[in-house]
Amino acid sequence: MTDALDSLISNHLARSRAAMERAAVDGALLASAERIATAIIGALRGGHKLLIVGNGGSAADAQHIAAEIVGRYKQERPAFAAIALTTDTSALTAIGNDYGFDHVFARQVEGLGASGDVLLAISTSGRSPSILNALRKARERGLVTIGFTGTNGLGMGELCDELLVAPSDDTPLIQQIHLATAHGICETIEAALMQDAR
């Protein structure tokens, strides 16, 4: 590989490290993450579920987070209720075809969400219509609404009970911060609910 290509990888890793270091000392992000963990813990303790939505890379993050909650993060324990609304291709394509892509998540929230559940909506831009519509529908149905976004997505906060803002406007870095923070939230949820089981 040429030096120029090698430097692209090195530069990305350096930017990634710097972004993670900023996130690790970002008081607002850390406080928001703690409140989000507390909200999800409360919902799961009450027999409710976590619904998660996102597009593209954020859809992959939604599935990853749901897998950590339903399967396990680190500890052997009972399964907890989490559903990524990004995985049912029949529902996604039927809703997209009949109602438009902007409603692929809102329609699922309407059918699957109940008061006391939590919707985690991930959008690096904070402007995705399908995500914003899901948040609106969740509010109508009495769900707790949580958003993950970047510094350009603050408008999304109007629809969220809690908004976690990655300190970046670079999509790949935002996604990396989201997933790393989500892992910390999953670890917190698991530890708290495991204490309940003892």
UniProtKB/Swiss-Prot annotation:
Pathway: Carbohydrate biosynthesis; D-glycero-D-manno-heptose 7-phosphate biosynthesis; D-glycero-alpha-D-manno-heptose 7-phosphate and D-glycero-beta-D-manno-heptose 7-phosphate from sedoheptulose 7-phosphate: step 1/1. It is found in: Cytoplasm. Substrate binds at residues 55-57, 68, 97-98, 123-125, 128, 175. Its EC number is 5.3.1.28. CDD domains: SIS_GmhA. Disulfide bonds: none annotated. GO terms for cellular component: cytoplasm. It catalyses: 2 D-sedoheptulose 7-phosphate = D-glycero-alpha-D-manno-heptose 7-phosphate + D-glycero-beta-D-manno-heptose 7-phosphate. InterPro entries: GmhA/DiaA (IPR035461), Phosphoheptose_Isoase (IPR004515), SIS_dom (IPR001347), SIS_dom_sf (IPR046348), SIS_GmhA/DiaA_subfam (IPR050099). Residues 40-198 form the SIS domain. GO terms for biological process: carbohydrate metabolic process; D-glycero-D-manno-heptose 7-phosphate biosynthetic process. Keywords: Carbohydrate metabolism, Cytoplasm, Isomerase, Metal-binding, Zinc. PROSITE patterns: SIS (PS51464). Catalyzes the isomerization of sedoheptulose 7-phosphate in D-glycero-D-manno-heptose 7-phosphate. Belongs to the SIS family. GmhA subfamily. This is Phosphoheptose isomerase. It comes from Bradyrhizobium sp. (strain ORS 278).
